Amino acid sequence: MQVVYNFSQPGLQWKQSDHLRSLMTVTSRDWLLDRGSLTRRLRVLSDDDLEVVPLREEVGVILPHEADVLGLQLGAIGGVREVYLVGFGRPWVFARSIIVNSGSIEEGSALLQLGNMPLGDLLFGDGSFQRSEIEVCRYHDACNASARSTYPLWARRSVFKREKMHVLVQEMFLPALWEEMS
């Protein structure tokens, strides 16, 4: 699968959910603001036919808005993981995670070698990660792919912290997910 979506669109406005709540449908609000494991919800929706398709797992430059939310300087380097979460053969979510660890390099590197294993299983597995507030973003024709859909592109992000490790998880909810639930 090729990457059609990305989080580097100019002018993205990440906001606390209260600022955009009135623009969300009941269904999108339920999914975007849920603090539980998205992986678990997608497994239920897909009758356990959820596939993780890795697109990128490497060390790279962190985008400016990512560095800002993580409290890092522009041009900072971190682990970058991009995947599609696919249900019934259709991409439902595009996820980009940024992993920074000022402690053990090995621990951070392990998260870049997950392959088709969901990151959510680790983040929610043992309860050791603390999750920040969820921020949301609505794309306004930011991607050509979204312009062809009747469903707006919504994304959310939050930071998971455990000791010296910080994992910024950004999830874009794709039109195929909303179509599956309609």
Swiss-Prot record:
Pfam families attached to this UniProt entry: Chor_lyase
SUPFAM superfamilies: Chorismate lyase-like
Superkingdom of this protein's organism: Bacteria
A GO MF term: chorismate lyase activity
Main location: cytoplasm
Example GO BP: ubiquinone biosynthetic process
Localization (cell): Cytoplasm
Catalytic reaction(s) noted: chorismate = 4-hydroxybenzoate + pyruvate
Pathway: Cofactor biosynthesis; ubiquinone biosynthesis
Annotated keywords: Cytoplasm, Lyase, Pyruvate, Ubiquinone biosynthesis
Keyword Lyase: yes
This enzyme's EC code(s): 4.1.3.40
Similarity comment: family membership: Belongs to the UbiC family.
Name of this protein: Probable chorismate pyruvate-lyase
Species assigned in the record: Pseudomonas putida (Arthrobacter siderocapsulatus)
